[in-house]
Amino acid sequence: MSRSSSPSVSLPLPSSATLFLDREDKTEEALGTFIELEQCTYTHKRLGDSRSNEFMECDCFEDYKDEQNHACDENSDCINRLTLIECVNDLCTSCGDDCQNQRFQKKEYADIAVFQTEKKGYGVRAERDIEANEFIYEYIGEVISEADFRDRMVDYDMRGFKHFYFMMLQAGEFIDATERGCLARFCNHSCNPNAYVSKWDVAGKLKMGIFAHRKILKGEEITFDYNVDRYGATAQPCYCDEPNCIGFLGGKTQTDAASLLPQNYADALGVRPSVEKKWVKMRKALGEEIDKSGSSNINIEFVESLELEPCVQYSDVNKVMSVLLQIDDKFICSKLLERILLTSDETMRYQIIKLHGYKCFSKLLGLFETDENTQHRILQYLSDLPKTTKNGIVSSQIDKKVESLLQKEALKEDASALLERWNTYETYQRIAKKDFTKTSNGLNKVTDFRRVRLPLGWEIIHENGRPMYYNAQRQIKRVDPPSDTHLQRPARTTPPQRYNGGFYDRTTKRPLDPESFEKRKRQRLEWEQQELAKKKQEEVRHLKEKLEVEKQKKSELEQIIEDANKQQEQQRLERLQKEKETAERRERRRQTHSASRIEHKWNKFFAQIVPNLIKSYATSMDRARIKECARDIVKILSSKELKKDATKVPPAEVTKEKRKKVNEFCKSYMDKLLAKMHEKAVSK
């Protein structure tokens, strides 16, 4: 059950990567097998829309070097980049035009080529080294609804398509690159891929991109895990030859080895592939069927079984917030909200606020409009968040959302208290690009100023026409950039103390008389002796605990060995039983496939006769009804032949006797149908 999720740490390069530099470049040949699209097309204009109601601005600033804007690059900490949102010219007002977070819009694709593989048809290889997490290609095709997806899946299967190119974009929406798409459609599957799929919000539309999971060498095939969000009508053998190969790809739900929910949901929920694998194994052992919600590709039962944990790393917050900003699935949102509500670490809470946190909470208050209990928990969490400026609250309009809750008696008190708290926050003018370009050297100043990475809780504000650093939680303003030391320990650690009617500072040193000096010296020696005794006691305690743990481990190991010896014979018997069941299933599949193939041949046999025999009835009913009758007659005749002999195949040519019998059946069927139609018309 491999998962190609967006990694926080790139995978190491394998010791022996296979290169295909000697294979002929088949790109031009491959382009002739489909219609190339420059961007996705939509069968309905609302398909592919992001679930965010408004565009999310980042807080980066222009950073021009060599006439190129380097803002929002890989190392910038851009909040849009962290939450998988692309910046858009004229909408992101501070980072400037043509920043580095516009890879989909600029089509900054990696240099790739199509080549012929041994068993998998066409494949895609890298024409240069590709670094970890680098954007490779957008998966482009026709964005269709779920109803169209199901129709096309049947249609392509009937037309005998060997390869499928469906990808789930979001709940109820799919990208179909089968007949219209781009070169990314030729990226093959691997159970141990070097690339992963990630979904980004680009100018209000959800886009699907392929990114490097690790460094990919020039000539190496680019692969990702189809079992994440890709669909096909019929299960196909997998030829990736990886040690962890699952054997098949495609089919109704990507086989039982497919992931239990989309990769970005799993990442945000903190689900590891091993957890999914263990759950699937347990369900199979109980003989229970594993299924997903058809429209959302989520196994509800599995998600309900998860024990959610708080966000403990920046990457956890990034993944949770990116999904919350993209979706409006109430079930998944409730689970991700639970992770946020469990997060009490102040560092993580600052990160939540930073990544469009107030906009996200405003969205959740609306999504759970009828769930007062959830709204109450959100209000309590908002009250516990660290203090910031009021700018984010106003721009997200969450204050208006909270004001609307004053009408609910159960929430009135909490909403009122939260609004009162927010009213104490200060509002500052946002630093805009124009404020720094009034002088000839203004741009260089703002570039240096905005490159400063601020410690936790600090913001950049604009006061009296100049930039300042502000910590709302500690009510501190600074002209020079703050450091972590300033965040952790203010300059004055203790307040001034009253002395003889005035004040003195405890941090001011005063000379000691000899008696006081000796007294302090004795106190220090006593304290050091006490600390030494405590450390010795602690060492003895740790040693006893270590011995006890080792004793317990030895006992557990002996028990494990004993249990293993007892179960060895049982495992052998289970293995033999499993091999027997596998052989029986293989035989049943062979028989089922054979019967289906014979039925298809009989359908084709009768389909070349029946339409011509009933076309004379075209004067009595419309063409569509005639076609429907032809299909029904073909199915009936095929069924009759299979009942006689399920192994018999139709003859190569239609005999006169067979044609006569078919003609008699068609005439009888159509006459009865016309009689029923006439009787129905008379009764009206």
From Swiss-Prot:
<dbReference type="GO" id="GO:0003723">
    <property type="term" value="F:RNA binding"/>
</dbReference>
<keyword id="KW-0158">Chromosome</keyword>
<feature type="domain" description="SET">
    <location>
        <begin position="110"/>
        <end position="227"/>
    </location>
</feature>
<dbReference type="Pfam" id="PF00856">
    <property type="entry name" value="SET"/>
</dbReference>
<dbReference type="InterPro" id="IPR001214">
    <property type="entry name" value="SET_dom"/>
</dbReference>
<comment type="similarity">
    <text>Belongs to the class V-like SAM-binding methyltransferase superfamily. Histone-lysine methyltransferase family. SET2 subfamily.</text>
</comment>
<dbReference type="InterPro" id="IPR006560">
    <property type="entry name" value="AWS_dom"/>
</dbReference>
<dbReference type="GO" id="GO:0005634">
    <property type="term" value="C:nucleus"/>
</dbReference>
<dbReference type="GO" id="GO:0006354">
    <property type="term" value="P:DNA-templated transcription elongation"/>
</dbReference>
<keyword id="KW-0539">Nucleus</keyword>
<keyword id="KW-0949">S-adenosyl-L-methionine</keyword>
<comment type="function">
    <text>Histone methyltransferase that trimethylates histone H3 'Lys-36' forming H3K36me3. Involved in transcription elongation as well as in transcription repression.</text>
</comment>
<dbReference type="GO" id="GO:0005829">
    <property type="term" value="C:cytosol"/>
</dbReference>
<dbReference type="GO" id="GO:0046975">
    <property type="term" value="F:histone H3K36 methyltransferase activity"/>
</dbReference>
<dbReference type="GO" id="GO:0006283">
    <property type="term" value="P:transcription-coupled nucleotide-excision repair"/>
</dbReference>
<feature type="region of interest" description="Disordered">
    <location>
        <begin position="479"/>
        <end position="521"/>
    </location>
</feature>
<dbReference type="GO" id="GO:0030174">
    <property type="term" value="P:regulation of DNA-templated DNA replication initiation"/>
</dbReference>
<dbReference type="InterPro" id="IPR036020">
    <property type="entry name" value="WW_dom_sf"/>
</dbReference>
<keyword id="KW-0804">Transcription</keyword>
<protein>
    <recommendedName>
        <fullName>Histone-lysine N-methyltransferase, H3 lysine-36 specific</fullName>
        <ecNumber>2.1.1.359</ecNumber>
    </recommendedName>
</protein>
<dbReference type="Pfam" id="PF08236">
    <property type="entry name" value="SRI"/>
</dbReference>
<dbReference type="Pfam" id="PF18507">
    <property type="entry name" value="WW_1"/>
</dbReference>
<dbReference type="Pfam" id="PF17907">
    <property type="entry name" value="AWS"/>
</dbReference>
<keyword id="KW-0805">Transcription regulation</keyword>
<dbReference type="GO" id="GO:0000785">
    <property type="term" value="C:chromatin"/>
</dbReference>
<feature type="coiled-coil region">
    <location>
        <begin position="518"/>
        <end position="594"/>
    </location>
</feature>
<dbReference type="InterPro" id="IPR050777">
    <property type="entry name" value="SET2_Histone-Lys_MeTrsfase"/>
</dbReference>
<dbReference type="InterPro" id="IPR038190">
    <property type="entry name" value="SRI_sf"/>
</dbReference>
<keyword id="KW-0808">Transferase</keyword>
<dbReference type="GO" id="GO:0060195">
    <property type="term" value="P:negative regulation of antisense RNA transcription"/>
</dbReference>
<keyword id="KW-0678">Repressor</keyword>
<keyword id="KW-0489">Methyltransferase</keyword>
<dbReference type="GO" id="GO:0006355">
    <property type="term" value="P:regulation of DNA-templated transcription"/>
</dbReference>
<dbReference type="GO" id="GO:0140955">
    <property type="term" value="F:histone H3K36 trimethyltransferase activity"/>
</dbReference>
<dbReference type="InterPro" id="IPR003616">
    <property type="entry name" value="Post-SET_dom"/>
</dbReference>
<feature type="domain" description="AWS">
    <location>
        <begin position="53"/>
        <end position="108"/>
    </location>
</feature>
<dbReference type="GO" id="GO:0030437">
    <property type="term" value="P:ascospore formation"/>
</dbReference>
<feature type="domain" description="Post-SET">
    <location>
        <begin position="234"/>
        <end position="250"/>
    </location>
</feature>
<feature type="compositionally biased region" description="Basic and acidic residues">
    <location>
        <begin position="568"/>
        <end position="586"/>
    </location>
</feature>
<feature type="compositionally biased region" description="Basic and acidic residues">
    <location>
        <begin position="506"/>
        <end position="521"/>
    </location>
</feature>
<dbReference type="InterPro" id="IPR046341">
    <property type="entry name" value="SET_dom_sf"/>
</dbReference>
<feature type="domain" description="WW">
    <location>
        <begin position="452"/>
        <end position="484"/>
    </location>
</feature>
